[in-house]
Amino acid sequence: MISRKALGSLVCLSAVATLIWIASGNWKVHYLPYYLPCPGIFSKKLQYLGDKPVQLFPQLFYQQPRVLAPKRQDVLTVTPWLAPIVWEGTFSPEILDSAYMPLNLTIGVTAFAVGKYTRFVSRFLKSAEMHFMKGYRVNYYIFTDNPKMIPDVQLQPGRRFDVVHIKKYSSWQEISVRRMEAINLHIAERSHREVDYLFCLDIDMVFHNAWGAETLGDMVAAIHPGYFNVPRSQFPYERRSSSAAYIPDGEGDFYYGGAVFGGLVKKVYEFTKICHMTILADKANGIMAAWQEESHLNRHFLTHKPSKLLSPEYLWDDRKPKPPEIFLIRFSTVDKNYQEVRN
């Protein structure tokens, strides 16, 4: 038996088809002030599992955006595939927070403190509490081979950090390539139930200015501070064709840093899984890519373009002088003796 609702939909569709057939003939078209009684079609609202309901922007007062007067004319603010590049002056934190705050999001952060890198945990967390996603719930996941060396840092309400015990490896290169695997397993086992977005950051870095909702996106990559103003022929891509991270000469958009990436937790899960698989393929062939997981990250983003790019403001190197294009530095590496901390 056909239900009354289904029968109503069929009648509605039949009426629409009849009107189209009439209009397509040679008859003169008349526009009638008549609306078909099809409320069942238009009243359906689907909410997929895990999705947050769309929020309306509240009434805000801000300067009118001007089409012919962009705030930034000195830098590229959108990629050829229409992904925004986030620079200071290209967004309004107030407008973004008015949209994202009502969603009650939880933002996750993974960082690896292995070996001597535990010394950077306290400064990383204290600076994050001052600048990272203020007003949002945040879960910090600190991966370490020595949980006893992780300090207890006072966090704001609604924010917590968990220590994730991982295996100790013999070299920093092995630690580097194992990072994708560890993040992927943690998402599968736990964090996919706990966070909406996940950022994967290096622990030997410090927040200096606000890092907020402007960084949220499906899949987010950060432009490397060492290569944002040079031609791609100078990018340190993996150039051996035998590697799964291989990028031929003449290809590539930007050089992305491995110290910062993130996005929706389900997107980060897929990304880390693919990168881990390509790393395993190289390992089976006795190959380690030029810059370990960073090389595989760049290869992936060549064919799977990120939906949002963060300017070098979000991944700076304190040893470099600040160029005029960088209005402020939000997140930067700690000056250190790499040989000493990696031994």
UniProtKB/Swiss-Prot annotation:
<dbReference type="GO" id="GO:0006486">
    <property type="term" value="P:protein glycosylation"/>
</dbReference>
<feature type="topological domain" description="Lumenal">
    <location>
        <begin position="28"/>
        <end position="343"/>
    </location>
</feature>
<dbReference type="GO" id="GO:0046872">
    <property type="term" value="F:metal ion binding"/>
</dbReference>
<comment type="similarity">
    <text>Belongs to the glycosyltransferase 6 family.</text>
</comment>
<keyword id="KW-0735">Signal-anchor</keyword>
<feature type="binding site">
    <location>
        <begin position="224"/>
        <end position="227"/>
    </location>
    <ligand>
        <name>substrate</name>
    </ligand>
</feature>
<feature type="binding site">
    <location>
        <begin position="202"/>
        <end position="204"/>
    </location>
    <ligand>
        <name>substrate</name>
    </ligand>
</feature>
<dbReference type="InterPro" id="IPR005076">
    <property type="entry name" value="Glyco_trans_6"/>
</dbReference>
<dbReference type="GO" id="GO:0005794">
    <property type="term" value="C:Golgi apparatus"/>
</dbReference>
<dbReference type="GO" id="GO:0005975">
    <property type="term" value="P:carbohydrate metabolic process"/>
</dbReference>
<comment type="pathway">
    <text>Protein modification; protein glycosylation.</text>
</comment>
<keyword id="KW-0333">Golgi apparatus</keyword>
<protein>
    <recommendedName>
        <fullName>Globoside alpha-1,3-N-acetylgalactosaminyltransferase 1</fullName>
        <ecNumber>2.4.1.-</ecNumber>
    </recommendedName>
</protein>
<dbReference type="GO" id="GO:0000139">
    <property type="term" value="C:Golgi membrane"/>
</dbReference>
<keyword id="KW-0472">Membrane</keyword>
<dbReference type="InterPro" id="IPR029044">
    <property type="entry name" value="Nucleotide-diphossugar_trans"/>
</dbReference>
<dbReference type="GO" id="GO:0030259">
    <property type="term" value="P:lipid glycosylation"/>
</dbReference>
<keyword id="KW-0325">Glycoprotein</keyword>
<keyword id="KW-1133">Transmembrane helix</keyword>
<feature type="active site" description="Nucleophile">
    <location>
        <position position="294"/>
    </location>
</feature>
<dbReference type="Pfam" id="PF03414">
    <property type="entry name" value="Glyco_transf_6"/>
</dbReference>
<feature type="binding site">
    <location>
        <position position="202"/>
    </location>
    <ligand>
        <name>Mn(2+)</name>
    </ligand>
</feature>
<feature type="binding site">
    <location>
        <position position="204"/>
    </location>
    <ligand>
        <name>Mn(2+)</name>
    </ligand>
</feature>
<feature type="binding site">
    <location>
        <begin position="112"/>
        <end position="117"/>
    </location>
    <ligand>
        <name>substrate</name>
    </ligand>
</feature>
<feature type="glycosylation site" description="N-linked (GlcNAc...) asparagine">
    <location>
        <position position="104"/>
    </location>
</feature>
<comment type="function">
    <text>May catalyze the formation of some glycolipid via the addition of N-acetylgalactosamine (GalNAc) in alpha-1,3-linkage to some substrate. Glycolipids probably serve for adherence of some pathogens.</text>
</comment>
<keyword id="KW-0464">Manganese</keyword>
<keyword id="KW-0812">Transmembrane</keyword>
<keyword id="KW-0328">Glycosyltransferase</keyword>
<dbReference type="GO" id="GO:0047277">
    <property type="term" value="F:globoside alpha-N-acetylgalactosaminyltransferase activity"/>
</dbReference>
<feature type="transmembrane region" description="Helical; Signal-anchor for type II membrane protein">
    <location>
        <begin position="7"/>
        <end position="27"/>
    </location>
</feature>
<keyword id="KW-0808">Transferase</keyword>
<feature type="topological domain" description="Cytoplasmic">
    <location>
        <begin position="1"/>
        <end position="6"/>
    </location>
</feature>
<keyword id="KW-0479">Metal-binding</keyword>
<dbReference type="GO" id="GO:0031982">
    <property type="term" value="C:vesicle"/>
</dbReference>
